[in-house]
Amino acid sequence: MGDYNGIGPEVTIKALQKIDYEKSIPVWIGYKSVFDFYHHKLKGQLRVREISACDDAKPGFVNIFELGHFGKSPVINPGKIEPDAGKAAMRAVETGIDLCLEEKTDALVTAPISKEAIQLAGYNVPGHTEFLAQKTDSKQVLMMLVNNGLRVALVTIHEPLKEVTSLIDKNRIINRLIVLNNSLINDFGIESPKIAVLGLNPHAGDGGVIGQEEIDIIAPAIAEANEQGITADGPFPGDGYFGTRMNEQYDATLAMYHDQGLIPFKTLSFGKGVNFSAGLPIIRTSPDHGTAFSIAGKNKADDSSFLAAFQLAENFIENRKHPV
């Protein structure tokens, strides 16, 4: 469902009008009243049924897994940041995680949440990825952005920039490379993946003139990953790497921090990219955009990214059934 005051319900409903119902049985986790509110606004024609257990889900329908209303129906205020909406969004995510862990569902596709709203609701996590890691007790979770052959993963995620340098260490990079390599094989079906690693400093340190991290930390991490059988190259300067389309020579790119990876990714893929959490015991994807409160409830949201997230989750399910 996502934050019901954002564009989450809208993009899910729009995407559910385009999926292949012979391939998947969708279970929409949230409030039926929220679904009905936006379905009516969008003049949707979906066949809908309410369920209390995934065993009751039927093909050809949007099966709504009702959460309950905390004793009252939610008051929907499109565009507003509210704790009740944040709490409901996280409750839906938590339910989805549990259903996947119990193998009642095969994958989880999350709609956008508001980091501010979930904080107001008492959830002290910076985002989906960290919450998923906590709930599944996963120690090595990798945030990866995907658009067809463009795949960008991150060493650090939602940390302030001033803290990034202290978080870049050899073991962290090696662990990220291991998770990334395994995901490229098991989720994407790439038999012998090639990974590029970006530097931390401008011009990848320029031989130590603009920082030592490339020499002291990143290059040794790459060398050790190579010794473990992972094909990884670098560190490459972050600015020229994407500009020269060097990324097209690799199956994935490992960036050191959030904006280093996501600015070029979204420049090349905005509205079409997918956020994937590698390293979890479950499959989880999401669109690469946020709640977009400014256009919520106005039938202006583009569902392309959510649809891509749904279809990528379908691909991962099949790839895990038929490993390379």
Residue ranges and their predicted role:
Residues 135-150, 278-294:
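Short, flexible loop segments at boundaries between secondary-structure elements
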Residues 120-142:
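Glycine/threonine-rich beta-strand-loop-alpha-helix active-site module
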